[in-house]
Amino acid sequence: MPFLTALQKRKRVAWAEEFKSFDVHQWKNLIWSDECYVHLDDHSGCVYVTHCADKEYDENCVIPTFKQSSMQVMVWGCVMKGRKRPLAVLEYPGGRGGGMTGQWYISQVLEAHLHTFYDQMKEERPEVVFQQDGAPSHTSKLAKQWLVDHGISVFPHPRSSPDVNPIEPVWHELKKIIRALLHPPMTIPKLIKAVHDAWDALEIPGIDKYVDTMSDRVQAVLKAHGVILNFKYIFVDVLYT
């Protein structure tokens, strides 16, 4: 879980106080967004295989591992109540912080993927607001100015707070689908296809259940005095299914 300073905890409490009265109709107007890395050897979850006693090392009963350095893809996605935009695979620049800069974020995400979707949702839901986390590329002067110039309203999001972004458990679901593949992808092109297929397989009602927990998440932040919520709360499928 992310480390939070005392100041960050206070800011989380202040954020929760500001939005504790939001109802489901107001949360419905938010576009929740995030980047995510998917590794070729991402087996962070438990993987169990049932096999005969003499098949312990059969290639169909084991999961290969790979060097993680180059075998990964970076994706960007956004969801909102009742909507899921097609997943975007991003060019991975590498380096500190993934190599993301304000200009990179503008060209790879805001211009290429968000702009059209936001305008579409604006017609459908006039009070639509865009959420992004506090990554330096997101909060750079260039990115902020681009958002202002294009009339995109931004919802405040406390730093280091994945627990109050309902897209986080959606990533968890996506990776579970990929980990469950009988024949895991062994090349970057196959991994990209697997990621797209997994995203397409995620159903809207399954995403909506996470968005619908926002009021509970806000109250939990207040109750915890700003402390980061336990990851079992982030992955609310443990609690709500």
PLM region descriptions:
Residues S107-H157:
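RNase H-like DDE/DDD metal-dependent nuclease/strand-transfer catalytic core used by mobile genetic elements
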Residues M1, G94-G97, K176-L181:
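Short interface patches used for recognition in eukaryotic signaling and trafficking proteins
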Residues Q8-H115, H225:
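Extended, low-complexity cationic-aromatic segments
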Residues E35-Y37, D42, V79, R83, ...:
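Residues that form ligand- and interface-recognition hot spots within folded domains
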Residues Q26-Y37, I167-T241:
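C-terminal anion-handling pockets and recognition modules
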Residues A16, S33-D34, G77, F130-D133, ...:
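Structural signal for hydrophobic/aromatic residues that build the beta-strand cores
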Residues P2-A6, Q132-G134, S140-K141, P156-I178:
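RNase H-like two-metal-ion nuclease catalytic core shared by retroviral integrases
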Residues T65-S69, G99-M100, W104, K122, ...:
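Conserved, non-catalytic sequence blocks in retroelement Pol enzymes and Pol-derived host proteins
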